Amino acid sequence: ERVIFVSGHFNNFELMAMHIEKSGINLAAIYRPLNNKFLNYFMEKIRKKYICKNQIKKGSSGTRQLLSLFKKGSSIALMIDQRVSEGILSKFFKNEALTTTIPAQFVKKFRCKIVPIYIERIEDIDFRLTVHAPINFSEDETIDTITLKLNSLLEIMILQNPDQWIWSHNRWK
């Protein structure tokens, strides 16, 4: 059953997608290309070879590609903690933040489940991956309420162990 995996940029977040794909789940993940084009070239190769073969560039063409892969049976991995240029204003740590609606749109269109996933460093090179129970939203929930619930879930993950969260951009800009 295809699902939407959601998380934030926790510790070595790339390991989450790698684990999902290595466990036999066909996965597609959205990524934002690195600003350094030279490094981005190598990072894309590494991601496709070792982490997740279906790496989709962020943007409207990427969203269409993601939709196509989902319709063909792929699950999707999304980092929902990034500041986006399109989305809705939704509460995040008591302030309105522009937030992606992609997970909520997929829930509404396909009645799919959301699976929260969290990774934390235990020590040195040891990590603990927590795959939460799937969330099944009711049909009468709106894009806004689903998005708010996912932001609340992300807050809980962050507050669990704040030093594990890689917060490199301002969500409230």
Task: Report each predicted region and the residues it spans.
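Catalytic core of membrane glycerolipid acyltransferases/transacylases, capturing the structured
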Residues: R2-G59, S85-S90, N95-E96, R121
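Non-catalytic C-terminal accessory region of glycerolipid acyltransferases
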Residues: K22-N26, S60-K173
